[in-house]
Amino acid sequence: RGTCTLASSAMIMRRAAMLAGFENWEDITESSVGSVAWREGVGISWTFTYDGVTMTHDYVSSVEDLKKLLEEHPEGIVAYDSNKPHAIALTDYDAETDTFYCSDPAECCAKARVPVSEAIISLENVDVVWYVTSPSNLSAPVMAANTKEDAEEQPSIPEIETAPVTSLDNLSHTELKLEMN
């Protein structure tokens, strides 16, 4: 019973809640999101809302589509390869190095933000995405601040670390750990 779409959605929803300044972002977990988004034997819903954060799905046909979505969604997106089938939390894109970054909930890859080249899917094969539709107009997180004042003025996202699970079929036990700096 793989729940990679659910784990990835919970990660992206938490990031959105933090960017929006929601004090209760810690309530957004794989288990809590699953209570409204997961259908046993079917998978994740196309559209769902938990604790003020709404996710919806769409289809993509290219890596360029993913770049555009990441520009519009600083919290990141869920990228799904229906042929694999597997999903990752696609967090950002570095144009200078032409590198995408993600958090992959699979046991072999369960780490904090890593290059997509370390994920078990290829972005060229991603055909479905989920992204946050509410709250909207989120500001991009500060990855590194030049001054203390810059850091205080900008929202920031803590590093996301995922605890390994025992198998790809048992992803429902993935835990999300966040550390605030």
Regions found by a protein language model. Give the residues of each.
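Sequence contexts marking disulfide-bonded cysteines in secreted/extracellular proteins
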Residues: T3-T5, C108-C109
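Residue-level detector of buried hydrophobic side-chain packing
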Residues: C4, L90, L178-M180
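Conserved active-site-adjacent core of cysteine acyl-enzyme catalytic domains
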Residues: A10-A151
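RTX-like calcium-binding, glycine/aspartate-rich low-complexity repeat tracts
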Residues: A145-N181
